[in-house]
A protein has these predicted regions:
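Generic long, charged, amphipathic alpha-helical segments
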Residues: 332-363
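Hard-cation-handling environments
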Residues: 176-319, 332, 375
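A short helix->loop->beta-strand "cap" motif at the edges of active sites that frequently abuts
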Residues: 20-25, 187-189, 221-223, 304-306, ...
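His/Asp/Glu-rich metal-coordinating catalytic cores
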Residues: 1, 5-9, 13-203, 209-218
Length: 409
């Protein structure tokens, strides 16, 4: 397991269910596995609620997997330290190295002994982090520089140059982000940050602490920073347990800052919403489709005293997040309630933790390998990206599509 976000690991319990009978080992770094347990359990709870709702509507359906399947799957998890070669059998040796994307994220080296005894070396990237915005990713490990392999299987989320950013863009956007928060807090407004419970919340806690702990205007007004969500609290505790050495001590110092207020109950959410004083609220989830954030959005979006700042992917065209932040329409329908957009809504794009277009090009150009295979990337732009990279790097590059998903090497 290269990382713990649900789009990478959320269906593992299904493989372990009675229908599928997976009996293998699940290997990953300690941080990845610990976070994954929290995210998978939360995913299962949502899945079960969805099944119950479908049944109440008369649909015949059953869960893809059960809680017992999930716990049985957890028993198959084994911690593998980064930068330690592990021999799985006489044919395969692996090693996890830092991907720099989020807590515990890894790339994996696989050395496969072929029948003729030669070694075929594969590197699979998972999601890779960017060096362009380390300023706003204080916990990110430095991505390992890879130089040589036979096959590199690469993500390419930022496969359009027009979507990319550089260090200058990051600096300007972060300054605007801080100015927007300061200006609107001093105007008595409530600021909502829809965030994902994993990684984004924890990094914002550090960013706010480093920026605001000694700011006179902030401390004089005693503005609270609300962290609202059960899952974000559980994952923050994983960070407290699994960060190492100075990072662990510093993160615990941040979490003990008296301006941070943690809420884990819906009654607490209602109490927070009843207050009119200015504050910063971080609530999950980032897509604004469900979770505590929906209640805050419904209250703040229609108010001139509300501010909503998005700092990551908020869903595709037609989603609630897109309708709020990107659509020119003046109203949004949320849970059958039509809301006129009166709040200030701003989107920031440089907070992404993905490697950027120019960094991918530089990586591919400097990599000595027989083939690069583009895998994790948007379908509509993948082929254009591959053609551009072939031209710019003079490398043999292919991409996985629904037409050619089997490769022989």
């Amino acid at each position: 397991m290269l990382m713990s976000r649900v789009d990478h690991c959320g269906n593992l319990a299904y493989l372990n269910s009675n229908n599928n009978g997976f009996n293998g080992r699940i290997l990953g770094t300690n941080q990845t596995l610990e976070v994954a347990k929290e995210l998978i359990e939360d995913t299962l709870n949502i899945h079960i609620k969805n099944i119950e709702k479908l049944k109440s509507l008369g649909r015949k359906t059953r869960p893809l997997y059960t809680k017992q399947d999930m716990f049985d799957m957890f028993e198959k998890m084994e911690v593998v330290p980064s930068y330690k070669k592990i021999t799985l059998n006489e044919w395969v040796t692996i090693e996890f190295v830092n991907a720099g994307h989020c807590l515990g994220s890894s790339m994996i080296h696989l050395w496969i002994k072929k029948p003729n005894q030669s070694i075929f070396h594969i590197i699979m990237s998972g999601d890779m982090g960017s060096e362009q915005n380390k300023l706003i990713h204080p916990l990110a490990e430095k991505r390992e520089q890879i130089t040589k392999c036979n096959l590199f299987i690469s993500e390419a989320t930022y496969n359009k140059k027009s979507r990319s950013f550089n260090k200058c863009d990051v600096q300007k956007e972060f300054e605007d982000f801080k100015c927007t928060i300061k200006e609107n807090l001093l105007q008595g407004k409530q600021i909502l940050l829809p965030v994902f419970s994993f990684n984004k919340v924890q990094e914002f806690l550090i960013l706010f602490y480093e920026w605001l702990k000694d700011e006179e205007w902030f401390n004089k007004n005693n503005f609270p920073i609300i962290c609202d969500g059960v899952l974000m609290h559980k994952i923050t505790n994983v960070f407290k347990r699994t960060l190492c050495d100075d990072k662990k001590d510093y993160f615990n110092e941040v979490c003990n800052w008296n301006k941070i207020k943690v809420n884990k109950t819906f009654d607490g959410t209602m109490a927070i919403m009843s207050k009119k004083e200015p504050m910063i609220i971080m609530a999950s989830s980032g897509f604004m489709q469900q979770g505590r954030v929906v209640a805050y959005v419904k209250q703040l979006l229609g108010s001139k005293k509300g501010v909503i700042l998005t700092t990551g992917y908020i869903g595709g065209e037609g989603s609630i997040g897109w309708k709020i932040a990107e659509s020119p329409q003046k109203t949004v329908s949320i849970e059958k309630q039509v809301i006129l957009k009166r709040a200030l809504v701003k989107s920031y794009h440089c907070f992404s933790s993905h490697i950027q277009y120019d960094e991918l090009e530089s990586l591919y150009a400097g990599l000595r390998c027989e083939k690069i295979l583009i895998h994790h990337s948007s379908k509509e732009d993948k082929l254009n990206f591959v053609n551009e990279m072939r031209k710019n790097t003079n490398k043999k590059i292919e991409c996985v599509t629904d037409k050619n998903y089997e490769f022989i090497f």
